[in-house]
């Protein structure tokens, strides 16, 4: 695992298909135990996670992150799974959702749960109070930085809902994260966003949805 902040660790890379990479992220700053965002592809990092204190909670951003690893993570660490309830049909084929997410709120781990449907019906982002006063925004596939350096949204014609996704992006534009971390990407894994530039990044992604829709 690679440490990218004093309280944030990145799992080794996985390549589901050419041009796409994924990671999971272990946040060690939560008051109720370590939090794993997204999901690993293998158990290769389990021992390092255990050495860092294990996984008390796991958060999925949407159904595409569900797979056999969910049950393995829960079995190894006894973790509590937080995930959007509207995607129970897909996630539930692998394991049980322990904390069903439905609306925007700050939970007992200090994480702000922000429903951002559009990429999928249950897509959800998470705003985390990171170390040194910085905030980390975990965006799943809702918005990410492409290999061309252009911010894009996870819009797939026929599968995603353009209008709903646009509304979700407008919502995210009001945030001011210091670090933006998507679950699948073609460029950098975690992107530092200087100052108030985030709203411009979101507008860039929204423009891309308009072109495709």
Regions found by a protein language model. Give the residues of each.
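Short, solvent-exposed secondary-structure boundary motifs
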Residues: 12-20, 92, 103-105, 115-116
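Residue-level detector of beta-strand structural context in well-folded domains
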Residues: 23-25, 102-104, 124
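Metallo-beta-lactamase
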Residues: 9, 15-17, 32-36, 43, ...
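Short, compositionally biased "basic patch" segments
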Residues: 1-26
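Active-site-flanking structural segment that lines cofactor/substrate pockets
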Residues: 18-27, 33-34, 40-48
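Active-site HxH/HxHxD metal-binding segment of metal-dependent hydrolases
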Residues: 41-109, 200-207
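Acidic surface patches and DE-rich sequence motifs
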Residues: 29, 107, 130
């Amino acid at each position: 695992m690679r440490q990218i902040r004093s309280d944030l660790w990145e799992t080794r890379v996985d390549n589901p298909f050419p041009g796409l990479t994924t990671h999971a992220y272990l946040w060690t700053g939560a008051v109720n135990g370590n939090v794993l965002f997204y999901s690993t592809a293998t158990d290769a990092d389990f021992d390092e996670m255990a050495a860092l204190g294990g996984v008390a909670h796991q958060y999925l951003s949407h159904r595409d992150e569900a797979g056999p690893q969910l049950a393995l993570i829960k079995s190894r660490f006894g973790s509590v799974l937080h995930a959007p309830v509207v995607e129970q049909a897909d996630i539930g084929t692998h394991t049980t959702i322990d904390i069903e997410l439905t609306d925007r709120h700050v939970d007992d781990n200090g994480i702000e749960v922000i429903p951002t449907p559009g990429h999928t019906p249950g897509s959800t982002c998470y705003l985390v109070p990171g170390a040194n006063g910085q905030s980390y925004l975990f965006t799943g596939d809702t918005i990410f930085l492409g290999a061309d350096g252009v911010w894009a949204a996870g819009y797939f014609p026929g599968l995603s809902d353009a209008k709903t996704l646009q509304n979700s992006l407008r919502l995210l534009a009001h945030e001011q994260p210091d670090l933006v971390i998507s679950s699948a990407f073609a460029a950098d894994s975690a992107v530092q966003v200087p100052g108030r530039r985030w709203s411009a990044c979101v507008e860039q992604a929204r423009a891309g949805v308009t072109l495709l829709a």
